[in-house]
Amino acid sequence: MVYFQWEIKPTKNRRTIMKNRKLILAVCAAMIMSMASCASSSSNADSSKAESSSQTESSSVSESSSVTESSKPDSSELTDNHHKYDNMTAEQIVAKLSLQEKANQMALPQILGLSMDSVKKNCYGGVLSKISAQSAADWRTTIDTIQKNAIGSQTGIPIIYGQDQVHGIYVCYNSVIFPHNINMGAANDKELMYKVGQITADESKLCHTLWTYSPCVAQSVDPRWGRTYESYGSDLGRITELSTSFTKGLLDGGLIVCAKHFLADGNVKYGTGEQGDIKMLIDRGDATLTDAQADELMKVYKAQIDAGAQTIMISHSSVNGVKMHENKKYIDKLKNELGFKGFIVSDWNSVQNTSAKTYEEQIINSVNAGIDMFMEVDTADEVVSTIVKAVGDGRISQQRVDDAVTRIIRVKQEAGVFSDPMFEKLETKQKDVGSEEYRKVAQQLVEKSMVLVKNDNKTLPLKKGTKVYITGPAADHAQAQCGGWTMEWNASPRREIDGVTTIQKGFEQLAQQNGITVITDKSKAAEADVVLLCVGEQSYAEWNGDTEDLALCGKLGLEGNKEAIKEAKDLGKPTVACIVAGRNVILDEADKKNWDSIVMCYLPGSEGQGVANVLCGNAKFSGTLPSPWYSDVKQIGTNDCWLKKGFGLKYE
């Protein structure tokens, strides 16, 4: 492990501090990624090297120092502090708290750099997870230590620990990594989505994490958006049905749900991306909506509220030029017209990108707009002091603070956090993450989410006795197969990930029982009857995936795509192209013509044997495109496309 020591000259300017900090973290990440690349041939998006640390906070730098045995209060300190609230309503609890204690409940600092003394002193409303992986046992230790300090505090209110469960417990070793939401949209199976919710809840509880920042209910309308794969697609009806089923599974499994990102994060216009320290093409941009269009998007959130979602996260983006973190119009609609009784949480440091000139004004405006808890990851104490001061001078009303904290306390009470903060009554269906039972469900989703878009000469399914040459950079690449938000935020530099069966390994496992010979040696490729060409995109997250170039062999294409495509063509064999990507990438017309079969796999996650099952005919194609597939970026936003939403061939 490499450590870096840096010295920054003191400054009173908070923005300068943040900018310097980001620069240091970016340099650290770039150096680490550079070293990792020497041992791996995988290639991540260039921009991720500089920016992934703004999320992961360079987790290699002694993250364990803030959670230690010495931080834990002794048992005498834990006896009664949270039990004093046992017979009180949320309103009664809030009435007992000082203004300082109330403001602390509105803060959501990140665990990295957070001392347990600070948790015990301030008793924050929640703690945001780090975005790097560890074992389930280590997660339990980490979260239990924080909770012991919270309930051992004078205030004694338990925290809720929040984590992005984007496609399973992606920061836990050996957990089930489900296909991404774009696959869920292609599968379009409500019953399976409910099961995914239950499994995610069970594995999350095995890590002692109760608050999940999911589902993402974005309507993805432009594939150039880097978060396209986090969406179920472009059809609002499909998004509503699938996300609601998922939410019900999470809730029945015992989690606190957070629907996101309110409002219109997937409807932003290309070219309006946020222009701060990082220049984005589309992410966090502006959506131009009529009232009728906004009302249609609100229906998805109404369904989430009716299903029981307890929290909603605000989008980084804007609607009609107003940042959602200060957009009182729509937040009021959420609480008043849609009847949302839970609490609203901000997204990562996004208050800092609102219109006010000072951070103090930004916080005040966001509170008054209706945000209840603040994910300002390393300025939590500044958020708290600003709220206290603003109530004192009348810029924030006491009523607004009481409403926010009542909502937070109510969610904690109803989720059982007060009655069992240390998970002593915890019940899970499995003893550990990554069970075979849960992997089978993930494999089912892989099989149902694959979309067959071309199958000339009935090349598929592969027949017994077929010799298959497997080639291409996505064939045996766990990270490419799982996509972003896997082990880390933007992507792990490793090709191999614990518990992941790649497409190639899946074929090798099934070869004998299906009477198929798998060839991976280039020198023997000419012996093959069929070429299985596995190509796709690099892994990325958020704005790192924003691109004007959607070509399969473009800026975000996997290194080796071009060479593998040429190799397959030169062999002159029937070719099955498997596309492993987070969106409908643009294919070369000649390639579309040359390939006998084309299969869109999207990002199938850990169970790559599901791909082999379908191609060998053990399972049938049933997936359909969740969004249109364009032939050219010029078609985006028009009715012209290569394949329409809902298209998908099946075996005859």
Question: What is each of the regions a protein language model found here?
Answer:
Residues 1-17:
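Short, Lys/Arg-enriched N-terminal segments with co-localized hydrophobic residues
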Residues 17-25:
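Bacterial N-terminal signal peptides that target proteins for export
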Residues 41, 63-65, 69-652:
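Glycoside hydrolase catalytic-domain context in secreted enzymes
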Residues 30-31:
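Repetitive helical segments and hydrophobic/amphipathic motifs
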Residues 34-37:
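C-terminal motif of bacterial Sec signal peptides marking the signal peptidase cleavage site
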Residues 39-71:
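Short, low-complexity, disordered segments immediately C-terminal to signal peptides
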